Every structure is written in C-alpha cells, then in structure tokens.
Amino acid sequence: MVSLSDRLDYIVGAKAADSLDEVFGIRTVDDLLRHYPRSYTKGATVRGAQDERPEAGEHITIVDVITEAVTLPMKKDSKKKYLRLTVGSGRNKVIATFFNAGYISKGLTKDTRVMLSGEVGFFRGVMQLTHPAFLILDSPDGRNRGSSSLRRIADASQAVSGEVLMSAFERRFFPIYPASTKLQSWDIYACVRQVLEVLDPVADPLPADLRAKHGLVSEDEALRAIHLAESESDRRRARERLTFDEAVGLQWALVTRRHGELSESGPSAPPRSDGLMAELMRRLPFELTEGQREVRDVLSDGLAATRPLNRLLQGEVGSGKTIVAVLAMLQMIDAGYQCVLLAPTEVLAAQHLLSIRDVLGPLGMGCQLGGAENATQVALLTGSMTMAQKKKVRADIFSGQTGIVIGTHALLQDAIEFHNLGMVVVDEQHRFGVEQRDQLRTKARTGIMPHLLVMTATPIPRTVALTVYGDLEMSTLRELPRGRQPITSNVIFVKDKPGWLDRAWQRILEEVAAGRQAYVVAPRIDETEDPQKGGQNSRPSETADGLYARLRSGELANVRLALMHGRLSADEKDAAMMAFRAGEIDVLVCTNVIEVGVDVPNATIMLVMDADRFGISQLHQLRGRIGRGTHPSLCLLASWVSPGSPAGRRLCAVAETMDGFALADLDLKERREGDVLGRNQSGKAITLRMLSLAEHQVFIEAARDFCTRAYEYPHLGLAPHPGLADLAARFIDTDRIEYLGKS
C-alpha cells in the first residue's frame, strides 16, 4: 500500500511522474493530492437538442459520432498538417482540431464513436475544441485508443468482454485541475485515481476533539472527497477541512518561528527616571495622544524584560509612530545599548535623521558644543556616502559614541561593528523581509538577541496580521495627533470631464499664490518603463520626466519646479528635498519615491496623474504626504478610466474615506492570495491553495488559538500530532514577506 510521503514514480510510472514534477513540482503522493481541482464538470454526455449550451472556457466532455474528418495543410507551413473533426450536428455540432496530428488521424475517421474532453470555445457560433483529450469507443480490435489519460481510465474499467464501461466516465461530476498543454486535466485525474486506489488510510494531523469542535471531517475523507465526491455537499465539507489544514499549517510555522526567537536572551533595559527618555518627555512641546502613551508603556515593559521584544507597530499616516520609537530607543541608550533604524530609501533615512535630531535637540548632540551632559549621537549611514564619511560613522558606532544609527539596505551589507547593539527598528516593514531584519540582529554581541520593533503606516487587515506578521505581537495607533488638518479627496475622470484637469492645475497655482506648496505625482519615471504596467487602458501613462518638461513651459510655467525620482543620485535627491522643505521649490514633480516618510507641513495639495496605475495602499500613503501642517489639504486623483470600471470604482473608494484600515480590507479583497505570503528560501512563491485571507478569518483565528495553546501549554493535553509539521512544511522556511510591497 501507499502513504502520503511516497514518491509517485513507483505508483503512476516514471513518465507521468516526471511530467508532474517538471510542470508543477509534484513529487510525492501528498503533493499530488494537494493539487486540488479548480472546478468540476459534468460527466461524459450525448448532448440533446434541448440541452443548454456551455459557456466559453467551460470544460466539457461529450460522446458522439464523427460526421467529418479532414486533414488540411497548415497556413504558415503547408508541409505540416492538422486534423479537423466534426461531431454532432445542428446547435450541438462541435469542431475539434488536432495540430501535427500524425498517428492520431488513423483512428479518428468518419462514423467513429468518440469521447472528446476539453475547454470549449466558439467560432461563428459553433463550439470548438483544440487538442482535446479523446477516446475511441468502437475500435475494431477492441483495444482502447486515445489520449493516455482517458485510455488508462478505460483500461482500468474495461468489462470482461473488452468493452469500455461508460460508467467510468458517466459520473455526475469530474474534477478539473490546474493544467498545462503538456499535462492536461485528464492526465492528472488519471494519476489521482491510480493513487487513491492504493492509498492507505491517512493518519489525521489534528486531534479528534478539535475536529469535533469545528465540525470537520477526517483528513482521509477530505483528501478523497475533494477529488472524487459527486455530491457538492461532500466536496464543500472537504474544502472546509483542507482550508482549516492550511490555516493550521501556516499558524504552526509562525508560532514555531515566534517561540524560536523568544528562546534567546534579550537585552534588559528598565526605564530610568534620570535618563534620556525621561528628559525628552519633559522637553516635548506637545502631549502624546492616549494611544501613543499606551504603546510607549507596552514597549517600555517589553524592553525591560529579559526576552527579546518582537512587536509590530502599525498606525495611520501621521499617527506619531516615530516619536514612540524614539522614546523606546532612548530607553535602550539609557541602559548602555545602541539602536539602529532601518529605512527603505535614502530619502526616508535622511528625513528620519532630520526629524529625530530636531526632536532630540541637545539630547542628540553628543560630543558637540551645546549638547546635553548625557547626550547621545545620531548618525546616518547610506550607500551613497563617501568612504571617508562611512569610515567616520563606523568609528563612532564601534566606540559607542553613536547611540542611534539610521540607514538603508547599506546597513545590511556594510562591515559595521556595533559597540553594544540592543534594538533594531525597521520602518515600513513591508519593504523588508524576515531575513533582512534578522540580519541586523546578528550584529549584536554573542548570546544577545536585540529587541525588534517594526513599523508600518500601511494599515494591515486582521487576517494578514495573523498570518504574514503572525510571528510578531501587534500594537496599533489609530488616533491622529491634535492639529492634523483634514484632507479632501476627489477623483477626476478626465475622459468625462477634461475641464476638471485644467481646474486642477489652476488650484495648484492658487495654493502656490497663497504661499503653499504642491506635489504632482506620476506612475513612471520616463518612457523606458512599461507604459501599461498596472494599467487598464491603452493610453500610455504620464512620466515624471515628461510632466516636468511640459509643466515648466505649460500649465505651471510661472512657478518654481523640481524633479524627484528614484534614478536621481543621492545628492540630487537630497538637494531637491532640501529645497522643497525649505520652501525654495513650489511644486515637486515626482514618482512614488515620496510615498513614505516625507514630511513637508507647507505642502497642501497633491495631484496624482494616472491614479489607476497605483494600488489602494500606495494612494493612501501618497495622500498622507499632505495635511501635515496648519492648512486644510486637497488630494486630486486624475485618471483616464471610466467611472464604472473596476479601477474607477477603486479610485472612488479611496476618495470617499480616510480610514486606512477600511481601505486595507478592500485592498486585500482585490489582490491575489499569492501576493500575500512572499517566497520561500528556494525562491518559489508561497501560495494559498484553499485558505482565503479575505474570507476565512474564523478559521485563521481558530488555528492560531489552537497552535499557540498547543505550543505554549503542552501540559493541557494539546500536544500536536506528528502530522502538524507536515502541514507547516511549505511555510516553515518562508524568509521574505512581500504582502504590502505589491500593494
């Protein structure tokens, strides 16, 4: 008999096993049985005159007599031939085409009774099948001839007389699998049938009481029913069980990672009443919100503990995450540790340097004239710095003079040595992976696992928080600091109302005349980038270079413009941002390089060109660059799509709410599940086969509860079955999280 871990070549044959491995990476019985059907089709039928016609793309299986069989030359190469069959007549006529037919044409002749199976198309109202699977049902010598998959099923179900038993094909439903031209659905079905006929009863990885609590069928029943059950209710119960399996596997991988990190020793840093953190609290020119105080206290308690803190801080744009992180870093510095803040771009890293130095004042001027007695240093380390600059920063870090190091990916590759690293802060977590944030933690002293705080201004749906970030505890800032100004958002559908775009340029001029500043955002840098990337129409999208050149002599000819995008050198980007921040530039023409972290309080209006080319979360992030000062702000989303299109409705949804959490839920419903989890260490995408983060919150929460209790409280009798590790296997080595990077 056969178990789930057995290789397929001993069961289905080397040729079929090699094809499954080559096309889908399917190697074992478990791999094959978890290659679930994508849909189901009715069994083989003789179509009647009154039968409803199938829809294009539907998988059909028909039995009928060939009324015409013609071999014709290919148009592009007359030496090559193709076979065209006509079966049935009238509205049920089907034309089947076989290219490079060769030996196929010998058996498929007029008046032969055949079975054809494939995806149906239509041409001039006639049903079409291209290279369908086929089976000759009245072969003169009684041998089964046809596609290997159908032939194998026919051979296995043949009567003593040699006649094909049609009952094998007349089931109410057949599974339709994700397939390819090389490996069709019938091929996969034949292998599945062959495996299930010899498969031993499958041991259940979940305890009986858990299955009973959630009304789940057994693993063995589910794996068989998902492929062979003819009843939809049986298939539904199988899907529920296999969905729960996937939720448990994912949560077990996450709880294993989480507790693996917690087993390390963390740098304990109790708060000091005479330290930098307490002094900054006394000097702050504003009051923290209630939410900020709560998160500060949670972080303070975590930093004082002897196990490493692992926490995600999410909050709306402008909710004040940075000051909370600064207070946490000062608590670590008070205890003799250093901190590193990892930012995704040099623009954001430079912004953090300015804002943190500004909020610290003399407390951040260590070894400088005018610095406080116990002041620390704040330093920047990026890839564009000169070797001499990097050498000076490295020396101050190694000596311990620098308490807060701010940098980009350069921190990961740089030969930097810390005097005593105690905390890693990662800003905009979705731009980094697990392996990158952990790479910094390895720069601490042996035996110490630095505390970890990761931050994002992109709100995260609860189901994503429980999965993608399931190895982290979570804090949320929803309350905006007092004084944040409202942002009005409007969509400009340019095709319908071209005059509104003219008015948008006029509004920018009005804001500039009032002494304020503006952003104009384009989806591309220049014409070398794919004009259709993310688009829904044939019109090439705007470019930052093109807009900048046009606006200088056109709509914004009389204002001071600057250009900002990712291909500029670090010095050019710094110069543009410094000039814009200083008020020397009126309008910044840019790409989404300003999506995160850029803080210019005097900027009050933003025009996003071809807004449909941006994701929901990107638009919400971009909009957060305005409304940061004392004046009400306006965000205009210009698009050439129609209002009723999916892209148009998405833009309207963004314009109608400033609730980033509501937009995050909408974003999750629209994206493919495969974008959520990222890739494993071999680079293969981690995809969800059954589990939907948008639809299965109940399953995800139940799985998290079970896995957490089973891991943390084995004395309660929740010790997991051995099969849990198998469910978690494809998630356990996930080393790169990409959920929000694709938003």
From Swiss-Prot:
One Gene Ontology MF term: DNA binding
GO BP: DNA recombination; DNA repair
Domain Helicase ATP-binding: 302-477
Region (Disordered) residue spans: 524-545
Chain positions covered by the region annotation Wedge domain: 44-171
Signal peptide: none
Assigned keywords, A-Z: ATP-binding, DNA damage, DNA recombination, DNA repair, DNA-binding, Helicase, Hydrolase, Isomerase, Nucleotide-binding
EC number(s) stated in the UniProt entry for this protein: 5.6.2.4
Coiled coil regions, renumbered to chain: none
Catalytic activity line of the entry: Couples ATP hydrolysis with the unwinding of duplex DNA by translocating in the 3'-5' direction; ATP + H2O = ADP + phosphate + H(+)
InterPro entries, per database record: ATP-dep_DNA_helicase_RecG (IPR004609), DEAD/DEAH_box_helicase_dom (IPR011545), Helicase_ATP-bd (IPR014001), Helicase_C-like (IPR001650), NA-bd_OB-fold (IPR012340), P-loop_NTPase (IPR027417), RecG/Mfd (IPR047112), RecG_wedge (IPR033454)
Helicase C-terminal domain sequence ranges: 520-694
Enzyme class label: isomerase
PROSITE patterns from the UniProt entry: HELICASE_ATP_BIND_1, HELICASE_CTER
Motif segment (DEAH box): 427-430
Assembly and oligomerization: Monomer.
Chain's role: Plays a critical role in recombination and DNA repair. Helps process Holliday junction intermediates to mature products by catalyzing branch migration. Has replication fork regression activity, unwinds stalled or blocked replication forks to make a HJ that can be resolved. Has a DNA unwinding activity characteristic of a DNA helicase with 3'-5' polarity.
Family statement drawn from the similarity comment of this UniProt entry: Belongs to the helicase family. RecG subfamily.
This protein's domain notes: The wedge domain within the N-terminus inserts into the replication fork junction, where the lagging and leading strand split.
Protein name as it appears in the record: ATP-dependent DNA helicase RecG
Organism: Mycobacterium leprae (strain TN)
Source lineage: Bacteria, Bacillati, Actinomycetota, Actinomycetes, Mycobacteriales
